[in-house]
Amino acid sequence: MIQLSPLLLLPLFSVFNSIADASTEYLRPQIHLTPDQGWMNDPNGMFYDRKDKLWHVYFQHNPDKKSIWATPVTWGHSTSKDLLTWDYHGNALEPENDDEGIFSGSVVVDRNNTSGFFNDSTDPEQRIVAIYTNNAQLQTQEIAYSLDKGYSFIKYDQNPVINVNSSQQRDPKVLWHDESNQWIMVVAKTQEFKVQIYGSPDLKKWDLKSNFTSNGYLGFQYECPGLFKLPIENPLNDTVTSKWVLLLAINPGSPLGGSINEYFIGDFDGTTFHPDDGATRFMDIGKDFYAFQSFDNTEPEDGALGLAWASNWQYANTVPTENWRSSMSLVRNYTLKYVDVNPENYGLTLIQKPVYDTKETRLNETLKTLETINEYEVNDLKLDKSSFVATDFNTERNATGVFEFDLKFTQTDLKMGYSNMTTQFGLYIHSQTVKGSQETLQLVFDTLSTTWYIDRTTQHSFQRNSPVFTERISTYVEKIDTTDQGNVYTLYGVVDRNILELYFNDGSIAMTNTFFFREGKIPTSFEVVCDSEKSFITIDELSVRELARK
């Protein structure tokens, strides 16, 4: 069972009253950030305003209702009090010309006014500086500052701050490095497979420190790098209690096709990132998680928080939504943990857990915008052909299409594997029945191979006519524990209209996938089934909760 870090939770399962009518915009997620209208892709500058207690997300945007990627590309802007309900504020940064773009970048809180852009009239917690790629004839790195808490920006009159005469250097991510007392930028030299590391005292003058080159899974190009320091949940000693993580996005070239994020664990000394090994580790093994970015200026108890674009460049421009395209993933909390990777080895792994509660919402209940409206729980159920779990949130025809499930189960028969025996059980997410038809997402666990199979096949014409949508995906999982009864596994999932986020074994593996039911259908019921005369799975704990806006 996924257990959220202390910062995050009051019941993880608090979350939305009558979410939008299922007959209108039925594919729009309700607890994931989406644009009010137009196109959205990479998350850009993201920060927490500690004074106003407000979360800011900028994103690649074109508000044109055609809802496809096209210039001019702007920075759209949304804010939230609780990371689940978002207010849209239009464009915050725009290019000089309509055939150009303000490409991806980041935002920092320049609390000590190292840039010299601010005076005492601007609160230190609201000294906002954006660092971005200006995409004109070349790609140059530029900066802008805000005097109104991040709602608009003034471009630096001596831009660019970095110009290497390249059309393929972009996506600067900037952070403050205490140990070397300087700003650090990681930026992609995309088609040379380089992450370039720069340092600056003032966000204006930058010196190249080192290059992280040709590491991991290359794909076609590197994009959207990131760098942060994370605590280790279960350190092996008192000496090493944290590690640095460098992140990369690659597109195209994912093993599943299109877009994916990978990460490296190591050390950073203010000049060079030193990876612990050469292994390729993927952040999220689904099809719809790209261009991850972390928040700047989070509270210490909030830890490292971030989100990603929940789509894939293979089909992002053609998904069947109305007047808008794309959503972000849920905000996730990030740590590191030693986990078993197979029966004989263990290693540090990125742990991801969705954020439903922050320091402020724990202190002030009125900030919460979500609640549980229906719930179902079962414990110690021996699953077989005659015993199953079934829930239906559409009995009053007012289902929200948003629910979560939290499952812990034990494989009690470890000697299975004969061809005449069932070795699988399934979790099924059903739509309501419309015009005599129902659609289903399938999550099947095979005990013989300890593998989850996910099938997001629907009858929507978009999916039927999109050969690159990759409807069937699988992942091996190692047991999370062993008891006298058998091997233990966990799975936490969030279903939100057209997006499914899965967190296996307490968040050591994450998988994000979109799906598109047709004819106004939304997810309304959840079922657990095993077609076996003999029980080999015990559901230790299962909770399913339907969520709605207050």
UniProtKB/Swiss-Prot annotation:
Q: Which residues form the signal peptide?
A: 1-22
GO BP term (any one) = sucrose catabolic process
By its UniProt entry, which SUPFAM superfamilies does this protein fall under?
Answer: Arabinanase/levansucrase/invertase (SSF75005), Concanavalin A-like lectins/glucanases (SSF49899)
Glycan attachment positions: N112, N113, N119, N165, N211, N237, N333, N364, N398, N420
Residues given in the record as substrate binding sites: W39, M40, N41, D42, Q60, F103, S104, R170, D171, E223, W313
Instruction: Give the record's keywords alphabetically.
Output: Glycoprotein, Glycosidase, Hydrolase, Signal
* GO CC annotations on file: extracellular region; fungal-type vacuole
Q: Where is the active site?
A: D42
Q: A GO molecular function for this record? A: sucrose alpha-glucosidase activity
Give the EC number: 3.2.1.26
Name of protein: Invertase
Q: Upper lineage ranks?
A: Eukaryota, Fungi, Dikarya, Ascomycota, Saccharomycotina
